């Protein structure tokens, strides 16, 4: 769904654990890391798209997570000119995103990057809350800063004071 301004409707997903860390995933075959995200299909609500993308990209189902909040409005970013496909109609110049903050209720082992036939990510880890703002590709940085600021009080209020154990995918960065 590309709107009349050339922005594709999209959902962004931030998954946090009980330590206030967020899931950070590496794009398949690349060196870039980001939060899960994906397009909203025709006839689909943003929440329906979020649950579909959540399963397709990280293998989690609704019972594995709890929605803590979502952004009050759609946030936009423009694609760099080199990434705009001029040969597709309508031309997509960027994304408009509705973001969701989810709390992981299940164990880390429920995360499965190979749940779909075409994995989006090939690795993931838990990182400190603000780490992604400094690390995401530059054209997404402003949106990440806005969404992380909007979600900060909610996300950080759910963290426990215990130190994360080093088990499984409990890697931390940042």
Curated annotation (Swiss-Prot):
The answer to whether keyword Signal applies is no
**Coiled-coil annotated spans:** none
Name any cofactors this protein relies on.
a divalent metal cation
Its EC number(s): 3.6.1.-
Q: Give this protein's Gene Ontology molecular function annotations.
A: mRNA 5'-diphosphatase activity
Q: What family is this protein classified in?
A: Belongs to the Nudix hydrolase family. RppH subfamily.
Q: What is this protein called?
A: RNA pyrophosphohydrolase
The major lineage groups are:
Bacteria, Pseudomonadati, Pseudomonadota, Gammaproteobacteria, Alteromonadales
């Amino acid at each position: 769904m590309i709107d009349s301004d050339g922005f594709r409707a999209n959902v962004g997903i931030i998954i946090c654990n009980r330590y206030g860390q967020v899931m950070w995933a590496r794009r398949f075959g690349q060196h870039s890391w980001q939060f899960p995200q994906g397009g909203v299909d025709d006839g689909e609500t943003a929440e329906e798209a979020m649950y579909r993308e959540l399963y397709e990209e990280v293998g989690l189902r609704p019972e594995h997570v709890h929605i803590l909040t979502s952004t009050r409005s759609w946030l936009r970013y423009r694609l760099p000119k080199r990434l705009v496909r001029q040969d597709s109609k309508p031309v997509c110049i960027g994304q408009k995103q509705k973001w969701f903050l989810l709390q992981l209720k299940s164990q880390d082992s429920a995360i499965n990057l190979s749940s779909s036939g075409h994995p989006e990510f090939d690795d993931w880890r838990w990182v400190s809350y603000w780490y992604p703002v400094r690390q995401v590709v530059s054209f997404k940085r402003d949106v990440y800063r806005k969404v992380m600021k909007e979600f900060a009080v909610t996300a950080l209020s759910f963290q426990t004071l215990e130190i994360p154990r080093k088990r499984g995918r409990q890697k931390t960065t940042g």
